[in-house]
Amino acid sequence: MNPNPNPNPIRLHVISASVRPTSAARPLAHWAAAQARARFEVTPVDLAEIALPFLDEPEYASTGIYAHAHTRAWSALVDSADAFLFVLPMYNGGFTAPFKNAIDFLYREWQGKPAGLLSYSAGGSGGAPAGRMLRPVLESVGMVPTEASAAVPGITGLVTADGFRAPEGLAAELAAVLDELAALARTPVSA
């Protein structure tokens, strides 16, 4: 049951943008979803469980004509969201190929929807370069990225068998992203 008392809650999909079996995205996304539940109707989405193949649709995504059941299911899931929080690892300075592939499968479903970024890395950047690289991609499919973002440097020391241990200040960073997502999701999109 969603603890959000709002009769029309914002439907936030928290997407783990990694398919690695040992990815830190899962425990980090679980933590982020827990932080968001007070204000949003949260749906966790794990790209590894979605298991999209490399883009195999014969038509361009902008047509909305989908030949494959996996694309239609992905379309319905993305379309059901009002906003997104992408939990984004950084690999070699960029974001993951499976995540780009998942974006490329669709077009209309992303239009006008706000997107927040929670990036992470093993190093000191917290994945911020991957987030900067992702922003123009999100804008190209008509999404509205938040100005605020949250970043987690040194992720390997923060994930244990018990889950993710948030460093000091991260909850406040994420709260700023969630505040902006809520404001953007409640703002009508102009044509």
State the predicted function of each range.
Residues P9-H13, P114, P153-D162:
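A short small-residue
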Residues A17-R20, Y107, G123:
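Amphipathic alpha-helical interaction elements
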Residues H30, A34, A38, D104, ...:
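Short, well-ordered alpha-helices that flank and scaffold nucleotide-derived cofactor binding pockets
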Residues P114-I155, E168-A172:
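Short, glycine-/small-residue-rich phosphate/pyrophosphate-handling segment
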Residues M1-N101, F164-A191:
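N-terminal beta1-alpha1-beta2 submodule of the flavodoxin-like/Rossmannoid cofactor-binding fold
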Residues T96-G112:
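Rossmann-fold NAD(P) dinucleotide-binding segment
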Residues T43-F54, V141-A161:
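Mobile beta-alpha loop/short-helix "lid" or hinge segments that flank ligand
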